[in-house]
Amino acid sequence: GQHWDWSHYFACARRVNDATRNRLAWLEMNSTPFPQFVGAPFSLYNDTNYMGNCGRSEKFPPIDRKIMRYAERGSRARRMMAKEYRHRAIVWGVQPQYCIDMLNWMIHCWGIVPLTDMLSLVNTRMIADTDTPENREQAFYDMAWLNENMIMRNRTHGGYKVLVDELWEFCETMNADMIMMWEHMSCKALTGMHGQFAEQARERGIHLVWVCHD
């Protein structure tokens, strides 16, 4: 049988931390008046990197560095992807990957810039990435943490706080005045909170747009 390779595990853990640092940097950049990492690249790329890769491939860090250079260059130049940003939006709910181009339509047709999405808001803390006896023990807790905070599970499992309350915190952090809410007709976890989202958005003066799909 195969033996567990701690050297390989911690090499992967370092790449996971690298991806986490980049994700946090992109979120911070998107909280400014000139967001650079938006739309399908944020959602699809983060989904693939977190769920499909999770540090296993050595190809991702060089790609991340290249993306970061482009994003930083655009931020310094204050580049915009539309002539005018009418609204800054958080994209919430379970998105349809097959029509992800709607994020581009939001920018180019309506001037709504999607700052981040629910499925991309996954792990934000560093895991142990140095091979020591203590970290070998910590690794099991880190792997459990990454599974607990996987896409969808970290929002639809954990109750009201992670699904509703934290949405308003993200709106404040990202300076968002709109929520584009994917309403997956088969996803009962979010459908059951329909009234709560609508009521609390009205109280906060945040525009809430429901986009139905299945």
Predicted regions located by residue number:
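Acidic, metal-coordinating catalytic cores used for nucleic-acid/nucleotide bond scission
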Residues: S186-L190
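Conserved beta-strand positions
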Residues: M181-H184
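A charged, amphipathic alpha-helical module
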Residues: Q2-R125
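Peripheral docking tails and interdomain loops at the edges
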Residues: G195-D214
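Redox- and metal-dependent alpha/beta enzyme cores, enriched for Fe-S-associated oxidoreductases
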Residues: I90-W168
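A short, acidic, amphipathic alpha-helical segment used as a generic capping/interface helix at domain edges
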Residues: G158-N175, G192-Q196
